[in-house]
Design a protein with these regions (language model features):
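Nucleotide-activated sugar donor-binding and catalytic core shared by glycosyltransferases
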Residues: 1-221
Length: 221
């Protein structure tokens, strides 16, 4: 059999002569992610991070050039929403040092997950440990999915959506085009054309509770 991820792919292979009877739509296996923690573990993680009711924005898998965009947005939004915190998770460990410098330049109090720093006295935590990002989505308010304001093509938004969290991204998401096409039909995901638009999209998720609750509900559709 010929198994394709999207209906568009099925059409394309049929157009170039693939036999109809063996060409099947399989769907995207990346839709099959499941949450790995129960509500007790999620509460425990929030306590471990000492979030104390703060709303944490998770900036996930950021690439070169994106950290500045996120830090700038956070700086603007922090003036309006004093209860927000930022978890910044660079995609590549070799960039940790550079990203730490960028964070330090903002003047915000910050810590590092590798030092077991918490949000108790910090506005920003850099996630510089491996294998923890997935569970961090469970305690975020919403997530920015990186690789989408660089030429990388984005990362998987479902990793945040499965926890019921909406996502914001830049428009460069060709790696997950079909997933984003599906998610952006509702408010589960929003693609922003510019850093300014991204800041506004983030602002709406913080300022408009009805919109935020709808966006959260849309993630499970």
């Amino acid at each position: 059999g010929i198994f394709m991820q999207t209906h568009g792919d099925v059409e394309r292979v049929l157009n170039v002569g693939a036999p109809n009877d063996i060409t099947k739509f399989m769907g995207n296996l990346k839709f099959d992610i499941k949450p790995t923690m129960n509500s007790e573990q999620i509460t425990e993680l929030a306590q471990d991070l000492k979030l104390n009711g703060a709303r944490m924005i998770a900036a996930a898998s950021t690439h070169k050039g994106e950290d500045e965009i996120i830090l700038d947005a956070f700086k603007q939004l922090k003036k309006e929403f004093c209860d927000i915190k930022l978890l910044l998770a660079p995609r590549h460990p070799e960039r940790y040092e550079k990203v730490e410098q960028l964070i330090a330049q903002t003047g915000f109090a910050y810590g590092k997950r590798s030092n077991n720093d918490t949000f108790e006295n910090n506005d920003i935590i850099m996630l510089d440990t491996m294998g923890e990002l997935m569970k961090m989505f469970s305690v975020c308010h919403f997530a920015y999915i990186g690789g989408s304001f660089s030429s990388t093509g984005g990362h998987n938004p479902l990793e945040a959506n499965i926890w019921g969290k909406p996502v914001v991204s830049g428009e460069c998401v060709f790696n997950f085009k079909d997933i984003y096409e599906f998610l952006t039909r509702s408010d589960a995901a929003k693609l922003s054309a510019t850093p300014e638009e991204l800041t506004n999209d983030m602002r709406r998720l913080l300022a408009d509770n009805d919109f935020y609750n709808k966006a959260c509900a849309d993630t499970s559709k």
